[in-house]
Amino acid sequence: MLRFLVFASLVLCGHSTEDVPETDARVVGGAEARRNSWPSQISLQYQYGGSWHHTCGGTLIRSNWVMTAAHCVDSPMTYRVVVGEHNLSQNDGTEQYVNVQKIVSHPYWNKNNVVAGYDIALLRLAKSVTLNNYVQLGVLPREGTILANNSPCYITGWGRTRTNGELAQTLQQAYLPSVSYSICSSSSYWGSSVKNTMVCAGGDGVRSGCQGDSGGPLHCMVNGQYAVHGVTSFVSSMGCNVARKPTVFTRVSAYISWMNNVIASN
Amino acid sequence: MTPSISWGLLLLAGLCCMVPSFLAEDVQETDTSQKDQSPASHEIATNLGDFAISLYRELVHQSNTSNIFFSPVSIATAFAMLSLGSKGDTHTQILEGLQFNLTQTSEADIHKSFQHLLQTLNRPDSELQLSTGNGLFVNNDLKLVEKFLEEAKNHYQAEVFSVNFAESEEAKKVINDFVEKGTQGKIVEAVKELDQDTVFALANYILFKGKWKKPFDPENTEEAEFHVDKSTTVKVPMMMLSGMLDVHHCSILSSWVLLMDYAGNASAVFLLPEDGKMQHLEQTLNKELISKILLNRRRRLVQIHIPRLSISGDYNLKTLMSPLGITRIFNNGADLSGITEENAPLKLSKAVHKAVLTIDETGTEAAAATVFEAVPMSMPPILRFDHPFLFIIFEEHTQSPIFVGKVVDPTHK
């Protein structure tokens, strides 16, 4: 028991220290994440033309369940999840590939209306993955938690590093401080497009999520611990890194009960 | 001395502006409400769908390695107009060749539907950028039936030219000038040669350069490879558009389906077959599937790459229409006595169809300026129209196929 507690403590400490950014030099405006910095991050891929294509990120929340965005799985394609991934085009030696067996999108999700919210889905994997240094469960916030404005957060993913650009090959991270609902829903920001069931982060015109990051996590530090507070959802059609158009996430703390119920009944 | 056999040349470069109303003198047409006309137009759309696909398959049969581009509406309306001046088998073959079921649709309804369709396409306030024109070229010693001439002018907006076909170079120039002027110089030398005994010619043209509701950004256009076939690749300017578009994968057709709206109530359906599935697509496509595609919009995030191109079609309609059963009008047994008062039989010795389309980045300014929406951030499927694909352009209200095209090599005009 004590040994386990010591191990858990070491993991948390390691996670904290390694995540202090050196520089944010270039997600859009991000930098390559250190290998196994974000072990709950997954790559969601679909099969087309005889090969697999990355479409979204996601968060491993149980050894056989992944949390992602509902819009990521709107199309009836064959999907798989890759955990322990770092370089999409190389064999890192740490990957585990597992098929998606079942998709449960939020019942109120409307694929023609992303700004209504409910952009969240759970994927049951065909088998449980093996947890290790490179594959961990994401820590979720307590139900109802609201982030303070300007909380320190990181978006991670393999999304485009430039509007209309190429996917990143290695996992990227970008520092996106949170933007409170009252600011984000003001008329000079997103206005009424943003709902209280969402989280905003970034909006400096430099750093943002971009295509390929959807479904992936927004890791925010609260009380010295990172938790996944957001599921990457949408940006402006004018471009990914538009000033005063923060990246918008589904607020995880609004869906804790729903997720627990889905997992319990499937 | 009048030749024993009169020859008629029909040049179809496009869309008839108006279909003449029913010519029979003893039938008094009553006005019908707009509501009543709409179902009739859809009747025509249904029939033109079958006609368009039959015509397409005939063209593929003639050559499956060439670009294809034609206007089903244009060809159908020209022949429907000719049916008003024809009788007997000549008359019957035309209507059945256009795939009208004469036991289900009356002839009066057919012509009424064409009239309504053409009024829709040529509305003065329409944002559609269709250029169409019609010319009747009559030998200076031939007298046309007054009724037919009147209808051609009033409903067809035809211009009538008296020419001396004995001077074939001069006659050819008159016809070519008419078409060239109407197409802003896009179609030159529409007629390359005239048969010695031609006494009657009809010229139509159609030119379309629409504006997208959701335009491409020219800055995103760059040179890319287009795979004509397994061993041939050409360089083309490839336009790019990313956003919420009407895209889905159709497993029945083994193809990706893209809908792009033009300003002015027209839509283009692009069909991109999976590798090796073009023949499957061509054999499987039918009007029911197309109707479903037009009615079921499925917006999703997608990135498309499509060639900027100008495509034209130039066809011998005798070769094309004969397999559809329209043969009598082209041979010595033709009965076109409703067109000319001469006792000598008139014959369609040559029929040519030409159409021109430009696909480029242009969109409506207002649409571009006001685009603002939230965009989900999944990595969009990237559809590269970098190998042969089909497209069909429809008038939205009637679902009439204005154009059908197959791009095998975008560098061929």
Swiss-Prot record, chain A:
GO terms (BP aspect): digestive system development; elastin catabolic process; exocrine pancreas development; inflammatory response; multicellular organism growth; negative regulation of transcription by RNA polymerase II; pancreas morphogenesis; positive regulation of angiogenesis
Organism: Mus musculus (Mouse)
Cofactor: Ca(2+)
Gene label: Cela1
Pfam families on file: Trypsin
Keyword Iron-sulfur applies: no
Keyword annotations of the record: Calcium, Disulfide bond, Glycoprotein, Hydrolase, Metal-binding, Protease, Secreted, Serine protease, Signal, Zymogen
Parts forming coiled coils: none
Cofactor: binding comment: Binds 1 Ca(2+) ion per subunit.
Residues carrying covalently attached carbohydrate according to the record: 87
Enzyme class: hydrolase
Superkingdom per UniProt: Eukaryota
Lineage, broadest ranks: Eukaryota, Metazoa, Chordata, Craniata, Vertebrata
Assigned EC number: 3.4.21.36
Signal peptide: 1-16
Name the UniProt record assigns to this protein: Chymotrypsin-like elastase family member 1
UniProt-annotated catalytic positions: 71 (charge relay system), 119 (charge relay system), 214 (charge relay system)
Disulfide bridges in this chain: 56-72, 153-220, 184-200, 210-240
Reported function: Serine proteases that hydrolyze many proteins in addition to elastin.
Cell location: Secreted
Family: Belongs to the peptidase S1 family. Elastase subfamily.
Binding site for Ca(2+): 85, 87, 90, 95
Peptidase S1 domain: residues covered: 27-264
Propeptide residue span(s): 17-26
Matches recorded under CDD domains: Tryp_SPc
Any one annotated GO CC term: collagen-containing extracellular matrix
From Swiss-Prot, chain B:
Entry-listed glycosylation sites: 64, 101, 265
Signal peptide segment: 1-24
UniProt gene name: Serpina1b
Marked site positions, Reactive bond: 377-378
Biological processes per GO annotation: acute-phase response; in utero embryonic development; protein N-linked glycosylation; response to cytokine; response to peptide hormone
Superkingdom of origin: Eukaryota
Record text about domains: The reactive center loop (RCL) extends out from the body of the protein and directs binding to the target protease. The protease cleaves the serpin at the reactive site within the RCL, establishing a covalent linkage between the carboxyl group of the serpin reactive site and the serine hydroxyl of the protease. The resulting inactive serpin-protease complex is highly stable. Variability within the reactive center loop (RCL) sequences of Serpina1-related genes may determine target protease specificity.
This protein's name: Alpha-1-antitrypsin 1-2
UniProt keyword terms in alphabetical order: Acute phase, Glycoprotein, Protease inhibitor, Secreted, Serine protease inhibitor, Signal
Location of region: RCL: 368-387
Subcellular location: Secreted
InterPro entries: Serpin_CS, Serpin_dom, Serpin_fam, Serpin_sf, Serpin_sf_1, Serpin_sf_2
MF terms (GO), sorted A to Z: serine-type endopeptidase inhibitor activity
Record's keyword annotation contains Signal: yes
Annotated function: Inhibitor of serine proteases. Its primary target is elastase, but it also has a moderate affinity for plasmin and thrombin.
Taxonomic lineage: Eukaryota, Metazoa, Chordata, Craniata, Vertebrata
More about this protein: Murine alpha-1-antitrypsin is represented by a cluster of up to 6 individual Serpina1-related genes. The precise complement of Serpina1-related genes present varies according to the strain of the animal.
Similarity comment: family membership: Belongs to the serpin family.
Any one annotated GO CC term: extracellular space
